[in-house]
Amino acid sequence: MSFSHREIESKWQKYWEENKTFKTEEDETREKFYALDMFPYPSGAGLHVGHPEGYTATDILSRMKRMQGYNVLHPMGWDAFGLPAEQYAIDTGNSPAEFTEKNINTFRRQIKSLGFSYDWDREVNTTDPDYYKWTQWIFIQLYNKGLAYIDEVAVNWCPALGTVLANEEVIDGKSERGGHPVERRPMKQWMLKITEYADRLLEDLEELDWPESIKDMQRNWIGRSEGAEVTFSVDGHDDTITVFTTRPDTLFGATYMVLAPEHKLVDAITTSEQKQAVESYKKEVATKSDLERTELAKEKTGVFTGAYAINPVNGEKVPIWIADYVLVSYGTGAIMAVPAHDERDYEFAKTFDLPIKEVVSGGVIEQEAYTGDGPHVNSEFLNGLSKEEAIEKMIQWLEAEKKGTKKVTYRLRDWLFSRQRYWGEPIPVIHWEDGTMSTVPEDELPLELPKMSEIKPSGTGESPLANATDWLEVVDPVTGKKGRRETNTMPQWAGSCWYYLRYIDPDNERMIADPEKLKKWLPVDIYIGGAEHAVLHLLYARFWHKVLYDLGVVPTKEPFQKLYNQGMILGENNEKMSKSKGNVVNPDDIIDSHGADTLRLYEMFMGPLDASIAWSTTGLDGARRFLDRVWRLLVDENTEEKSSKIVNGEGSPELKRAYHQTVKKVTEDFEELRFNVGISQLMVYVNEAYKQEELPLDQAEGFVKLLSPVAPHLAEELWSKLGHEGTIAYEPWPTYDEAFLVEDEVEIVVQHNGKVRAKVVVAKDATKEQMEEAALANERVKESIDGKTVRKVIVVPGKLVNIVAN
């Protein structure tokens, strides 16, 4: 006999919605728990089975915490700006707003059908003007603090698409979408000064309960390095070139210098003989993205400028080259090359036959670069010193001679914040005809996106908003001065930088959120989502949070106390699910055939939450069979009422022990996100219960409570079958008694001359004499020692009896 999942699930979803079961009230008497999911981008494809994995995990925690008496905040919303909606709109002539709304409705329906306990009154949508009013407000605060500025930077410009592309959108010098040529060109862009927060973003990672791998990715992305800036003069010119190096101790081994092709001095120092070669190389490099240029495996290319620099430490002339592996955006856009002790420089020197000079002993320079430590050689006042000593001494020398200085640099660049697109938050800035600019007055926010029938890129490097003349042109009501609005929009990251704050007070029209509520709910207690957001989203959100902390808006230094990344659900063939492979599993189909509770249980039981595991229909069927067994255990198949097996009583000692062990184990495993192990223990209890004639009512009730976070619809139905009114959602979580966890009896091993002959059960606190007596009374032991003389009996309490007899 199995239960009707369609009937039960729609009944309880309706009940939760009508009764607002999961609405979060402000209640000062209870401890808070804030469980957050990474909100989804509502794509046209709808939800896939990967989404519910993380959502089910946070839902189990939220439901358990409610039953443990916590005041739980568990919200959901939509990260709805972005390129796909805009591209769809351009391709079909429809509005991105309508497309987005339709997708959100699909996502909401699908998510509700999975029975997650969200407070839907707190739903946010990044494309709602009442929401992005505050995204714009934060931008204005960044601008006022000097953290938002306009700069001319080299970007990936695609003439055919008429827009700038992110590095990730460029493959082999062509646009990922459509395969059009892409060129590097300098353009004015909005930048956010995240570099100003680099040290704090690095240091505060120590305080977070995050996976070490994610912390490391952020550390590497920020890329703090200590070293020195060294100034080289250019032979025959007044110009100097500054380089940053983490190894100033190897300065005596610098035999050439490399500039980024875009470095501002290249044209000035290139000799007439080398001009043509330099120009054509610069053209060739202009089509490559930073990622392609710095790939370690690629062949080294470069051109000599004809100019020489003077090595400040020994006065030697070193040739100045240009090469694409040096980026103008990184460090100073120039490097001193020490081929004997750097792999890239070594390859370059070998390719172009440049001198290689050993200054740290320990390697075989004829074969490869030596990057290890060792006594310095060929280095005058550094000879014999180790790396650390030599770095220290060289920095002292450079500073004394005014040829360099100690310096810390970061790999982290300022955040390129503007997009030449329509479907994003308008940047609230006005450019005036006299060359000044100002932000839109805060009382005029939100600055809404104008409705446009034609949203093709303008092709001029501006967004389609440049064509919305009525919206674009403004006049200062006080001075009569004319101005133009900023036409760039914000990137998709903007709205997701602070959404967790808006959930706390989503209808507040006066501020982001009430400070008292922020104080109560922050930081987020658990944040679950995919590892693909390890760097960008999490770093950007931490940056904005720190700015808001400095402004006194938020009370904590960090937004997310604990972070957890769920694994990926792969197709049955162990490949990533994708439409092109035809291996995508649609949750709607599973909910229809097996039920939402089965899907939730299966995704939590597949394996560890952070592992990537292949989908298995057999596993799904197994999950459903378990829920059917639970139903049959508690419900009489003829009457559809509570099973006659359920009685008011104590139950057997074995079952009592299994029950208390289950409560303890499930509680601990769920707390630690080991859902697969906790579910295994629920199965152990069900197996034990099936062996018994009777099942005590209090155990049946406790078991249903333990099951309820994983399979909430079925648990609600069983709770009502056990004679209760209303919902199980706020019933107290079961507790266990240590006294019943202890087993009264133990199994001991009996040996004859060290060989196992039998196992016997004795009382846990049996004396040595009682253990010996039980061992000698065993039939198999009697046979074994028959006719022999017992010389000695060795007893290890609670473990073993060894009879020495011959």
From Swiss-Prot:
Its EC number is 6.1.1.4. The keyword Cell inner membrane does not apply. The keyword ATP-binding applies. PROSITE patterns: AA_TRNA_LIGASE_I. It is an enzyme of class 6 (ligase). Disulfide bonds: none annotated. A motif ('HIGH' region) lies at residues 40-51. ATP binds at residue 579. One of its GO terms (molecular function) is ATP binding. It catalyses: tRNA(Leu) + L-leucine + ATP = L-leucyl-tRNA(Leu) + AMP + diphosphate. GO terms for biological process: leucyl-tRNA aminoacylation. It is found in: Cytoplasm. A motif ('KMSKS' region) lies at residues 576-580. GO terms for cellular component: cytosol. Keywords: Aminoacyl-tRNA synthetase, ATP-binding, Cytoplasm, Ligase, Nucleotide-binding, Protein biosynthesis. NCBIfam families: leuS_bact. PANTHER family: LEUCINE--TRNA LIGASE, MITOCHONDRIAL (PTHR43740:SF2), LEUCYL-TRNA SYNTHETASE (PTHR43740). Belongs to the class-I aminoacyl-tRNA synthetase family. This is Leucine--tRNA ligase.
